[in-house]
Regions:
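Bacterial N-terminal signal peptides
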Residues: 7-16
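Extracytoplasmic small-molecule ligand-binding "clamshell" domains
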Residues: 23-102, 236
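Short loop->beta-strand "edge-of-pocket" segments that line small-molecule binding or catalytic clefts
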Residues: 25-41, 132-149, 182-183
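Short beta-strand->loop
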Residues: 104-114, 201-215, 263-270
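A conserved helix-loop-strand patch within extracytoplasmic ligand-binding domains
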Residues: 108-154
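A bilobed periplasmic-binding-protein/Venus flytrap-type ligand-binding module shared by bacterial periplasmic
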Residues: 118-134, 216-234
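Pocket-lining segment of extracytoplasmic ligand-binding domains
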Residues: 138, 143, 147-231
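An extracytoplasmic/periplasmic, membrane-proximal ligand-sensing/linker region
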Residues: 239-307
Length: 307
C-alpha cells in the first residue's frame, strides 16, 4: 500500500509538471528585411529579444523569428491585424492614430524618438539650391518623396510640404536619381547606411548638409488586437520596463545611437521643428527623458532652431 501510494504521489507530481514543461514557447514572428542591405530594423528585434529574455523566468520560453518572405508595411500591418490567420504577429513601426486603432500598440518609444530627426538624400543640383535657402518656407518650395503608407507622409502633408508619393521603397531611390522629386526624407538613424547602399547605383547621390526636420515620431511594437496579442503586449511592456529599470535599455540605445550617428555631423544644422498631428495621448510626455532624446549634445552648440 505504501508503495502504491508513493507511486500515485509521484504520478500526480509528474502530471502537474507536464503542462509547464510541454508549454509551447511564445512565438514572435516579424517581417524580414526588404532586401539584403536593409538593416533598419535589426536594433528593434534585438531589443525585443532582450526584453523577452529579461522576464523569461516569469513568462517562459520564447521564439523570435523573421517570416520567410519580404512584405511591405501595408501587407505587414494587414497580416498582424488578421490575428491567428496572419503570417506574422508583430511589427515595429512609427506610430499613427490609424495604426493604433487597428493594432495593439505597446506605447514605449523604442529609439527614444530618434527616428523623428529627419535629413535628406539629394542630388548635387538640389544641394546647390539648398545652400542658398534659410527658411522653412523656402524649403517647402521643394518636393519630398514619400511612400504613401509611411507615418510621416501624413505629418509632412499636415505641415504643408509638397509630396511625391510612391508605393515602393527601392523605387523612391530610383525616382530621386531621375529627378522625379527633390528631397528624400530619411531618419538620421538610417540615412548613412542607405546612402552607402545606394551611392554606387545612383551617381551623385549625397546626404544634404544644412537642414534637419524634427518632430516627435516614436516607434512602437504592434501586435494583434486579440487575447494572444494582449499576452504578447503584457510581456513586451514588462520586459522593456525591466530593461529601463536596470539601465540596459539606455545602454543599448546609446550604443545604437553612437553607431547610427557616427558618420553624421548634426552640429551647425538648422533645425525646423514640426507638429506631429498623428501622436496620440498614449505616448509618454515629451519631457520624459527616460523615453525621449532631444539630441541636445549632438545639435549643440552651433545649432539654431528654425522658426
Amino acid at each position: 500500500m505504501k508503495v502504491s501510494a508513493l507511486c500515485l504521489l509521484l504520478s500526480c507530481l509528474l502530471n502537474a509538471a507536464l503542462p509547464a514543461q510541454a508549454a509551447e514557447p511564445m512565438s514572435f514572428i516579424h517581417p524580414p528585411p526588404e532586401n539584403t542591405s536593409d538593416k533598419r530594423h535589426t536594433y528593434y528585434w534585438e531589443i525585443l529579444e532582450a526584453a523577452l529574455q529579461s522576464n523569461r523566468s516569469k513568462y517562459g520560453d520564447y521564439k523570435v523569428m523573421p517570416y520567410g518572405t519580404p512584405m511591405n508595411f501595408q501587407r505587414a500591418a494587414a497580416e498582424v491585424e488578421a490575428g491567428e490567420k496572419g503570417r506574422i504577429n508583430i511589427v515595429s513601426r512609427a506610430t499613427n492614430l490609424e495604426l493604433e486603432e487597428r493594432l495593439r500598440a505597446i506605447p514605449i518609444p523604442l529609439d527614444k524618438g530618434l527616428l523623428g530627426y529627419r535629413m535628406f538624400l539629394v542630388m548635387p543640383e538640389t544641394q546647390a539650391r539648398l545652400d542658398n535657402m534659410q527658411t522653412l518656407e523656402e524649403l517647402k518650395q521643394l518636393t519630398i518623396g514619400q511612400a504613401s503608407v509611411w507615418t510621416d507622409t501624413k505629418i509632412l502633408g499636415d505641415n504643408n510640404f509638397k509630396l511625391v508619393l510612391a508605393d515602393n521603397y527601392e523605387g523612391l531611390f530610383q525616382m530621386l536619381g531621375v529627378r522625379r522629386y527633390d528631397l528624400f526624407s530619411r531618419g538620421a538613424i538610417e540615412i548613412h547606411a542607405e546612402w552607402l547602399a545606394h551611392k554606387n547605383k545612383i551617381p551623385g547621390l549625397t546626404i544634404e548638409k544644412k537642414f534637419v526636420l524634427a518632430y516627435p515620431m516614436p516607434r512602437y511594437f504592434f501586435v494583434p488586437r486579440n487575447k494572444d496579442g494582449e499576452r504578447m503586449a503584457e510581456r513586451i511592456e514588462d520586459g522593456l520596463r525591466r530593461l529601463a529599470k536596470s539601465g540596459e535599455f539606455e545602454r543599448r540605445y546609446q550604443a545604437y545611437k553612437k553607431l547610427v550617428l557616427a558618420d553624421l555631423d548634426l552640429s551647425g544644422r538648422k533645425v525646423f521643428r514640426l507638429t506631429n498631428t498623428q501622436l496620440s495621448d498614449k505616448a509618454p510626455p515629451l519631457n520624459d527623458k527616460l523615453w525621449w532624446d532631444d539630441l541636445a549634445p549632438e545639435l549643440a552648440p552651433s545649432n539654431r532652431t528654425g522658426r
